[in-house]
C-alpha cells in the first residue's frame, strides 16, 4: 500500500497486486462493479481473509450518487448483510424508504455535543461526532428510538435524533477522513 501511495502522489499508476498482495485493482464499471463490490464485501474477503463484513470492511465511494455511490451501495449491502427478519426490529421512513435495522452499521453525520453515552452501564459523558461509526444494537419501533454501540460508548437516539444517523456500509471518502479500517474497497472510475 505504501509503495502504491507514493506512486499515486508522484502521478504514476499503482502496481497491480497478486493473490498474496494487500493491494488489488479489479477492472469493472457500473452495475457490474456494484455486484462485484457486494460480492467482495459479503463473500470473497470474509472467506479469503477472515474479515467480518460489517465491522472490518469499509467501502469508500468518491460520490453519493450512481450505482457505485454510497446511497445505492448502502441499500444493496444492507439487503445482503442485514436483511429484514422477524427478529430484527426496524424503523422505516415512508417517504424515502430509508430503513434503520438492528444490526446495521451506521455513521453519525453531524456533531451532537449533547447526546449522552454510557460505558459499562453507567453514564460516562456526552457527545457524538461527525464520522463516528457504530452498530445498531437495539430498535424500539414504537418510540422510534435506536441504541448504537460506538466502540466502548453506547448511545440511545430518540426519534428526533435519527436524522443524525446514516447507513455506513459504504461512505464517501470525504466522510471517512481520519478513519482507519482493516480492509477498504474503493470504486474508482476512469483509472
PLM feature spans:
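Conserved helicase motor core of P-loop NTPases
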Residues: 1-126
Amino acid at each position: 500500500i505504501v509503495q502504491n501511495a507514493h506512486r499515486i502522489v508522484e502521478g504514476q499508476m499503482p502496481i497491480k497486486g497478486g493473490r498474496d498482495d494487500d493491494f488489488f485493482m479489479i477492472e469493472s464499471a457500473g452495475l457490474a462493479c456494484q455486484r462485484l463490490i457486494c460480492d467482495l464485501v459479503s463473500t470473497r474477503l470474509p472467506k479469503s481473509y477472515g474479515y467480518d463484513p460489517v465491522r472490518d470492511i469499509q467501502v469508500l465511494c468518491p460520490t453519493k450518487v450512481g450505482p457505485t455511490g454510497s446511497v445505492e451501495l448502502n441499500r444493496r449491502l444492507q439487503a445482503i448483510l442485514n436483511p429484514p427478519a422477524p427478529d430484527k426490529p426496524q424503523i422505516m421512513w415512508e417517504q424515502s424508504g430509508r430503513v434503520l435495522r438492528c444490526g446495521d452499521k451506521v455513521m453519525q453525520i453531524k456533531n451532537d455535543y449533547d447526546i449522552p453515552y454510557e460505558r459499562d452501564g453507567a453514564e460516562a459523558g456526552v457527545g457524538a461526532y461527525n464520522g463516528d461509526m457504530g452498530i445498531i444494537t437495539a430498535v424500539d419501533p414504537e418510540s422510534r428510538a435506536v441504541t448504537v454501540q460506538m466502540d466502548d460508548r453506547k448511545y440511545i437516539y430518540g426519534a428526533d435524533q435519527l436524522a443524525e444517523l446514516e447507513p455506513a456500509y459504504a461512505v464517501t471518502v470525504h466522510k471517512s477522513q481520519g478513519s482507519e479500517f482493516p480492509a477498504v474497497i474503493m470504486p474508482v472510475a476512469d483509472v
